[in-house]
UniProtKB/Swiss-Prot annotation:
This protein's record includes keyword Transmembrane helix: yes
Listed InterPro entries: Chs7
Record organism: Yarrowia lipolytica (strain CLIB 122 / E 150) (Yeast)
Gene: CHS7
Entry-linked Pfam families: Chs7
Protein name: Chitin synthase export chaperone
Cellular component, GO annotation: endoplasmic reticulum membrane
GO BP terms in the entry: cell wall organization; chitin biosynthetic process; protein folding; protein transport
Family: Belongs to the CHS7 family.
Positions of transmembrane segments: 55-75, 92-112, 129-149, 164-184, 193-213, 220-240, 259-279
Membrane disposition: Multi-pass membrane protein
Main location: endoplasmic reticulum
GO terms for MF: unfolded protein binding
Compartment(s): Endoplasmic reticulum membrane
Length: 335
């Protein structure tokens, strides 16, 4: 296996792109590429089910994607409610990208367009582009705490959305040139996937590492909050666990549970937990400073109890009224 090859990854986990790349060597008689001489086989695949004359692939992973959608929407709604919090628009943008990625993963994993169909390479390319756009949004969001630029401004959001679109298009175009043999060349194609590996795995890994290190530096040296350090550490744990579950031990899980699920099921869950820790870190580091909280949280300046009789300003009745009487008559003098 050379640099940029997907042999090891596809052998351990049934990634959607594995149907569209490889083999890298000339196939022998005992090797059976999946589609038109192209494709890499995995050691184990989870079972599919037939529902209403429709075959659904990755059943367990599909249900996790469906369950993740309301969780993401709840986080987005909560972020919208904190009007004056730093990084509110940037976090909402990241969650929007992750929501789009989840929807595309649901479409691809469930087999809405099965492998071999004309739409399949385009859907997988969109999914790959969504991954790059989401990771780019994450690393930009990680720099907000250092206040290198003013957050939430029109210029800042225009830059973020524009660069996110560029990251999406870069990976999307490279994916199409890799997946479709007639589009490719000797430098890029199903049998030469170095470019796709760099933009999809190497760049995104750098983005994630930069984000994690920046948040640790922010929590340790600037905020100096043990709970925020714990949130970053927990999010890092979930992300690392998702990669281990997705690649090294996915086929082991699949074989042990008789092909009902594989590592992608647990990797999707842990990835969602990692995103929830991103949201939690931001929620812990920001406070609502409006006089009346929009998110229906208790205001930190709100008076919880009425002033009682023991504070030196007790009420008394005058002429049947519980309010204090007027002192106007006391100030009148007889001449």
């Amino acid at each position: 296996m050379g640099f940029g090859d997907f042999d090891f990854l596809c052998n351990k986990s049934p990634l959607p792109l594995c149907m569209l790349v490889g083999p890298y060597d000339k196939p022998t008689t005992d090797q059976t590429p999946l589609l038109n001489g192209i494709g890499l086989m995995s050691e184990c695949y989870p079972r599919s089910i037939e529902l209403a004359n429709t075959i659904i692939f990755q059943v367990g992973n599909t249900f996790i994607h469906i369950g993740a959608l309301p969780v993401i929407l709840i986080m987005m709604y909560t972020v919208k409610g904190k009007y004056t919090a730093i990084g509110r628009k940037e976090l909402f943008h990241f969650l929007s990208c992750f929501l789009f990625l989840t929807c595309m993963s649901l479409v691809v994993d469930a087999g809405v367009a099965p492998p071999g169909s004309a739409a399949y390479p385009y859907l997988v390319a969109i999914q790959n582009g969504a991954i790059s756009g989401t990771m780019w949004s994450l690393v930009n969001f990680g720099f907000l705490g250092f206040q290198f630029y003013e957050d939430g401004t029109r210029r800042a959001m225009l830059f973020l959305r524009g660069t996110t679109l560029c990251a999406f298009l870069l990976t999307f175009i490279i994916s199409l040139f890799t997946f479709i043999p007639s589009w490719g060349s000797d430098a890029i194609g199903p049998h030469n996937t170095v470019g796709l590996f760099v933009v999809l795995y190497l760049f995104n890994l750098i983005f994630v590492v930069v984000y994690i290190l920046s948040q640790f530096a922010l929590a340790i040296f600037i905020l100096q909050d043990i709970w925020m350090i714990g949130a970053v550490a927990l999010g890092t744990f979930f992300f690392v666990a998702s990669q281990i579950l997705l690649y090294p031990i996915s086929s082991i899980i699949c074989k042990q549970v008789k092909h009902y699920i594989d590592g992608t099921f647990f990797a999707t869950v842990t990835n969602l937990f990692a995103v929830m820790m991103v949201y939690k870190f931001w929620d812990m580091s920001t406070k609502e400073d409006l006089e009346f909280s929009v998110g229906q949280k208790d205001n930190m300046w709100e008076t919880k109890e009425l002033l009682g009789e023991d504070n030196g300003m007790s009420r008394y009745e005058v002429n049947g009224s519980e309010y204090a009487g007027s002192t106007f008559a006391l100030n009148q003098h007889q001449f």
